[in-house]
Amino acid sequence: MTHITFQAPYSWGRWRWVAMIKFMKKLLSLLFLALMAVSVMAQKNVYKFSVKDGNERTVKLKDYKGKVLLIVNTATKCGFTPQYEALQKLYETYKKQGLVILDFPCNQFGAQAPGTFRDIHSFCTGNYGTTFPQFAKLNVNGRSESPLYTYLKAQQPFKGFDLNSNIGKFLDEKFRAENPAYAKDPSIKWNFTKFLIDRQGRVIDRFEPTADMKDVEAGVKAALKMK
């Protein structure tokens, strides 16, 4: 009588070995990300970071040493998009005193920054006459976020929406429904979040998209007076 023996593709020993390798790879990946985060947090200013311009050329933020920077994640199809007008006015008013606005399109919020850099740049210059530097699209949250934004968020956590405005109330209710403790999370919540950088490259303030532009201007004026 012939006996037929069925053998599992992997013995238990080999299966455990494969599982262990997968676990170690995942652990090493997490450790690598953690070390990167620690390295980013150790920075004392924004000048160690580099970004890409619209032609994917590297731009070092140390090129802006001595300037007051307003770093903004933007979108062209957002309810806050008209803020471009106020940003351009702010830039024209204070650029001779040392203000530079750095515009970073981001498509992470409702896919409201579609298209290529050329599409976005043409929209902004054509509709709002923007003349401040605009950079390549990037991510501000998540595993693929820009190291610059990892640093910015660590230095200035979420400040809260303006609950005196209808849009501020709406956004607060929206995020609170998803996570009651959302305000403790430093992540970028929406388009047109602004970070204010002083002349030494330190992140000194954060303005949520619902912040009054008069408050943003006041912050810029104060930063320009700082030595």
Predicted regions and their residues:
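Non-catalytic, surface beta->alpha helical segment in thiol-disulfide oxidoreductase systems
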Residues: 205-226
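Conserved helix-turn-beta segment immediately C-terminal to the redox Cys motif
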Residues: 67-68, 76-77, 81-105, 124-128
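Glycine-biased, low-complexity coil/linker segments
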Residues: 12-13
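Hydrophobic h-region of N-terminal signal peptides that target proteins for export
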Residues: 33-41
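N-terminal "domain-start" segment that seeds a small globular fold
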Residues: 41-62
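Thiol/selenol-based redox catalytic cores and closely related redox-interacting motifs
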Residues: 129-209
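Sec-dependent signal peptide recognition
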Residues: 25-33
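Thiol-based oxidoreductase modules, predominantly thioredoxin-like and allied folds used
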Residues: 98-115, 131-142
